[in-house]
Amino acid sequence: MSTTTPTADDDDVTLYIQDVTLRDGMHATRHHITPENVAVIAGALDSAGVDAIEVSHGDGLAGHSLTYGPGSNTDWEWIEAAAAVVHCAKLTTLLLPGIGTVAELKRARALGVQSVRVATHCTEADVSAQHISTARELGMDVSGFLMMSHLAEPQQLAEQAKLMESYGAHCVYVTDSGGRLTMDGVRQRVRAYRDILDAETQIGIHAHQNLSLSVANSVVAVEEGVTRVDASLAGHGAGAGNCPIEPFVAVADLHGWKHNCDLFALQDAADDVVRPLQDRPVQVDRETLTLGYAGVYSSFLRHAETAAKQYGLDTRQILLAVGERGLVGGQEDLITDIALDLAARQ
């Protein structure tokens, strides 16, 4: 257990920038992207100096389904495309136990994936034991990913993080899937992690922009001792997007934090390559702000918009109802039920 809290005032703060454009960003394009575009983005990220590049369906390996959204290509086609052009960064993927299996993990490893984030709901870390331990056996860098972290109090979340550490995770994330956490919420959770985790266990932050706080939350996290930061080109991701990598890197420069990223190269990739792929602007607007306000899983946005159009509803009505019911990832099908209930009351 750590006895001191690291601070970002130290001259030796070195960040590990994990890009999620090609995983969380899949939600923004309904999991449709060509392997050719994956290669272009992955190559640009590798050249720009990010430490790791995550590639998979938005809901992780084997996420292709009617519930989560069928992809235009398989995980394997996307991973192979990225692996062919990534020479410096660690090729990473996401796995949700119950969706992806150990078999998929092993196949990803064989294709060149070096790092995996094993994701569970914030109170269900115990289901990650087999996948984390197997990843360690495969010689992979392994992180635990506690989704919807705002739904667990700091101490409870830290206890779940400790479980993931005990299974072999090198790092555990505060994962703000709903973009609901404010700076104080992030600060409290990172401190709770640091108080209970071993000093050598790293801590990560995965922020969403739904309340326009993703950069601020990531900065606060680093100030409290986080070293791994998730970000994406142009914030490309579910809901209002992830922490946009360009402004975060700019702020890191202003703080004097060490990293390997080329800011201008990231800006060019964001504006020239990623933004043109978006069929819906990834931004804070009335729908995505409601995600954060109601604490709703960011990937529910497109599902709610589809249901709203089908049943003549305001997307915000659906999202508020989803938040009231406390739906979590994997319950996308219930969005239609909620829409039907709301439509019947009109």
Swiss-Prot record:
GO MF, one term, reads: manganese ion binding
Q: Which Pfam families match?
A: DmpG_comm, HMGL-like
Q: Which reaction does it catalyse?
A: (S)-4-hydroxy-2-oxopentanoate = acetaldehyde + pyruvate
The UniProt entry's sequence similarity note says:
Belongs to the 4-hydroxy-2-oxovalerate aldolase family.
What Enzyme Commission number does this protein have? 4.1.3.39
Key words of the record: Aromatic hydrocarbons catabolism, Lyase, Manganese, Metal-binding
Taking every annotated instance into account, which residue ranges of this chain make up the domain Pyruvate carboxyltransferase? 15-267
Fetch the NCBIfam families from UniProt: 4OH_2_O_val_ald (TIGR03217), PRK08195.1 (NF006049)
- Please tell me the species this chain comes from: Rhodococcus jostii (strain RHA1)
TM region positions: none
Task: Name the chain's protein.
Answer: 4-hydroxy-2-oxovalerate aldolase 1
